[in-house]
Amino acid sequence: MSAQPVDLQIFGRSLRVNCPPEQRDALSQAADDLNQRLQDLKERTRVTNTEQLVFIAALNISYELTQEKAKTRDYAASMEQRIKMLQQTIEQALLDQGRTPERPGQKFE
């Protein structure tokens, strides 16, 4: 489906953006999150310049995204290492099983 215009209110300003219908709810949640972040920043920093608040919020969001990407990379590397260890353990167990007779007195040919 093609994108459709969506009207948003960001920190008291109207903004119209195009968005696929199936992503409309996610966009609305993102706008709500941004509004909350801007409001929190305004209260915490006492900055009244909207443009400055938007830049600070953008930097914070970018930093959080960078941190999450690093966590994801670290997690993927950790899982890859665990999978390799499990694979080696399984391969060794299969090799050991092939070397060990299943019943006492059974001999390999």
UniProtKB/Swiss-Prot annotation:
Give the record's keywords alphabetically.
Cell cycle, Cell division, Coiled coil, Cytoplasm, Septation
Cytoplasm as a keyword of this entry, yes or no, is yes
What family, per the record? Belongs to the ZapA family. Type 1 subfamily.
Q: What does this protein do?
A: Activator of cell division through the inhibition of FtsZ GTPase activity, therefore promoting FtsZ assembly into bundles of protofilaments necessary for the formation of the division Z ring. It is recruited early at mid-cell but it is not essential for cell division.
Assembly and partners are described as: Homodimer. Interacts with FtsZ.
Residue ranges that the Swiss-Prot or TrEMBL entry lists as coiled coil: 21-97
**Chief place where the protein resides:** cytoplasm
> What is any Pfam family matched here?
ZapA
Q: Mention any one GO cellular component term assigned to this protein in its UniProt record.
A: cell septum
* Entry superkingdom: Bacteria
Q: Which InterPro entries match?
A: Cell_div_ZapA-like, Cell_div_ZapA-like_sf, Cell_div_ZapA_eubact, Cell_div_ZapA_N
| Keyword Cell division listed | yes
Its recorded name reads Cell division protein ZapA
**GO BP annotations, alphabetical order:** division septum assembly; FtsZ-dependent cytokinesis; septin ring assembly
Q: Where in the cell is it found?
A: Cytoplasm
